[in-house]
Amino acid sequence: MIANALNGKPLPVYGQGLNVRDWLYVEDHCKAVDLIVRDGRIGEVYNIGGRNEMRNIDIVKLIIEDLGQGEITFVTDRKGHDLRYAIDPAKIKDELGWKPSTCFHDGIKKTIRWYLDNRSWWEEIISGEYQGYYQRMYGDR
């Protein structure tokens, strides 16, 4: 979404954007995975979540507001698309003491800043092969 907004491309949102997801800053996710690898019990499953559920449309609107650019395009929702993914991270908190250290709003701002500061890195990724994937996924919607 951020790359699309920065490149003047539409921001595709499934359905009306009412799907709810649990949002978590990437560094918090990486720290949780590292903690599980080091201190988790072998064979156990640990859900990693931020307890920060938000609708997709609200996330996209935050990105547009922060960047001052971007246009939403509503696309046909996927068949069987879950309306809500609820993550219960109680086990990782209780057993390993993990919880996110970055609040959502700080995390989204850091993420947007990363995209602004690292254009040369991500622009290579969204060219060529990735463009074919993107067209297959969203071209007809």
What are the residue ranges of the model-derived segments?
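C-terminal substrate-binding subdomain of Rossmann-fold SDR/epimerase-dehydratase oxidoreductases
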Residues: 2-141
